[in-house]
Curated annotation (Swiss-Prot):
Membrane topology: Multi-pass membrane protein
Taxonomic source organism: Latilactobacillus sakei subsp. sakei (strain 23K)
Stretches that traverse the bilayer: 1-21, 31-51, 57-77, 91-111
Designated name of the protein: Fluoride-specific ion channel FluC 2
Compartment(s) of residence: Cell membrane
InterPro entries the UniProt entry points to: FluC (IPR003691)
Length: 115
């Protein structure tokens, strides 16, 4: 049952991320805005979920499943690599610092909101 909960959640999270990315593709920018926003909202939600201390099945479905499928560490690092190799260093460092710096802050804010 646990595997099914996680798998269904991951599918829902991935579909949500895909749809949001499609919607945001019309924004012409070198800055990967949709990945940035997806990862920040996912960080906040996971922080909230952790602070809420919900039941294990709910946490597995939402945290490991939905938010695991929704957020994307691999896309973040792929985009960072592309920016670096295209010599877009100012965007690279801004994206890197904002994602990790704000990611920690919004996760902490989510945690405290969930208490």
């Amino acid at each position: 049952m646990t595997i099914l909960l996680v798998g269904l959640g991951a599918a829902l999270g991935a579909i949500l991320r895909y749809q949001l990315t499609r919607i945001g593709n019309h924004i012409a920018s070198e800055f990967p805005l949709m990945t940035f926003l997806i990862n920040l909202t996912g960080s906040f939600c996971l922080g909230w979920l952790t602070g809420s201390q919900l039941s294990q099945p709910v946490t597995l479905f939402l945290g490991v499943g939905v938010l695991g499928g929704y957020t994307t560490f691999s896309t973040l690092n792929s985009e960072l690599s592309q920016l670096w190799f295209r010599r877009r260093y100012h965007i690279f460092f801004g994206y890197w610092l904002l994602t990790y710096g704000l990611g920690l802050l919004v996760a902490a804010a989510g945690f405290y909101a969930g208490l």
